[in-house]
Design a protein with these regions (language model features):
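Penicillin-recognizing serine hydrolase domain
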Residues: 2, 109-111, 115-119, 123, ...
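Active-site-adjacent loops and short helices of periplasmic peptidoglycan-processing enzymes
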Residues: 95-261, 270
């Protein structure tokens, strides 16, 4: 075994051995410090490079894109203040167009009597025509179904649009049958009967004939639908906001309605037409002779007949009337009359249980508010 390559521990050389070992340890520490220093420097250099790179990228990530700034626009010159416009002179009241009316609804006053238990009818109005005021009322603006009071408007529109009352119309079964089946009141004209326009007008009002109103509608407008449109146009021309018609006779329809105050205005407009006033005032009428009625069809306004022959109105007088009835409308009537001193009045009632109650309400209103104590006595 070769022992020359290995150093042996010699106690006599111990100090020298310790010094050699210390030098080796010091050398290793220096090497470690240098390596550590190099590592730290490398880390610092890497961090600086990363920071510089982030500062280059960050503005593109964090800064919002915005439009380039525009130079401020110059402020506009203040607009000159407009000169005050001269106040317009009030326009003159327009004249009513043809077909329109200057009539207005009667208005209530402090003197208007409010009726309640003294009437059978649930709605009523008594109007002084000359002053345009309401003398007495009960629910005058409540919705009603006008039933055959509708025929006052039918009469008015037909009379205004018939150039020749002697022109004729031939009655048809197609007109008669549906109305008969609906329970409408009839004048009595029959299929194939040739009737003058005048006789149709009387037949629509005096006996309240629904076949006469349908014939008038066809003669004037070509159909009932077209004629009803004319009726609603007339209502609008009169300023009636609570009236709408669906047919010419007053057969019940939920969309066929009015109020007693507006029916009063329709009657007032009709009475200003000479032909209508004559027909609404007729107690009896006999139509022209025809093949089917050789003596002419006889007609009677039963309401006028009764009030003229069975009642006293305290000096007042009922001069015109049109009644109506359906199960929904019950008994109603629009009448016109005169006070003892000659003033014109209009009375409309609706929703009385019987025809007798309807008549009694008109008698009571004319007697109490239009008659005189001297005449009653």
């Amino acid at each position: 075994m070769n022992h020359e390559s290995q150093q042996q521990f010699d106690p006599e050389n111990a100090p020298a051995f310790e010094r050699l070992r210390d030098r080796r340890r010091a050398k290793r520490r220096r090497v470690l410090r240098v390596a550590l220093t190099l590592f730290v420097c490398a880390a610092l250099l890497g961090g600086a490079a990363y920071y510089a790179h982030r500062q280059i990228i960050k503005p593109y990530l964090d800064t919002p894109v915005s439009a380039p700034e525009q130079p401020p626009l110059p402020e506009p010159d203040p607009a000159p203040e407009p000169e005050p416009a001269p106040e317009p002179e009030p326009a003159p009241e327009p004249e009513p167009e043809p077909g329109q009316s200057a009539l207005t609804e009667a208005q209530a006053t402090d003197a208007t009597k409010t009726l309640d238990l003294e009437l059978y009818s649930s709605s009523a109005v008594l109007v002084d025509v000359q002053s345009g005021t309401v003398l007495a009322e009960k629910g005058m603006d409540e919705k009603i179904y006008p039933a055959s009071m509708t025929k006052v408007m039918t009469l008015l529109v037909a009379a205004e649009n018939l150039p020749d009352l002697d022109a004729t119309f031939t009655m048809t079964q197609a007109i008669i049958d549906p109305l008969y089946l609906a329970g409408a009141s009839m004048a009595g004209y029959v299929n194939g009967e040739t009737v003058t326009m005048r006789d149709l007008l009387y037949g629509a009002v005096v006996p309240s004939g629904a076949e006469a109103t349908e014939a008038l509608a066809q003669a004037v407008a070509g159909s009932e639908e077209a004629f009803v449109a004319m009726m609603n146009e007339k209502a609008a021309a009169l300023g009636l906001a609570n009236t709408h018609f669906m047919n010419t006779s007053g057969l019940h329809d939920e969309n066929h309605y009015s109020t007693v105050r507006e029916i009063a205005l329709i009657l007032q407009a009709a009475l200003e037409n000479e032909t209508c006033a004559e027909i609404l005032s007729a107690e009896n009428y006999r139509a022209s002779e025809t093949e089917q009625h050789p003596d002419g069809l006889a007609m009677t306004n039963k309401f006028l007949y009764r009030v003229h022959h069975e009642y006293s109105l305290g000096g007042a007088e009922i001069t015109a009337a049109k009644t109506g009835y359906t199960a929904e409308a019950m008994n109603c009537c629009a009448s016109a009359g005169k006070t003892p001193d000659g003033r014109s009045v209009i009375c409309v009632t609706a929703n009385a249980w019987t025809g007798e109650f309807c008549i009694e309400d008109h008698i009571a209103l004319y007697t109490k508010y239009c008659g005189s104590a001297e005449a009653e006595g």
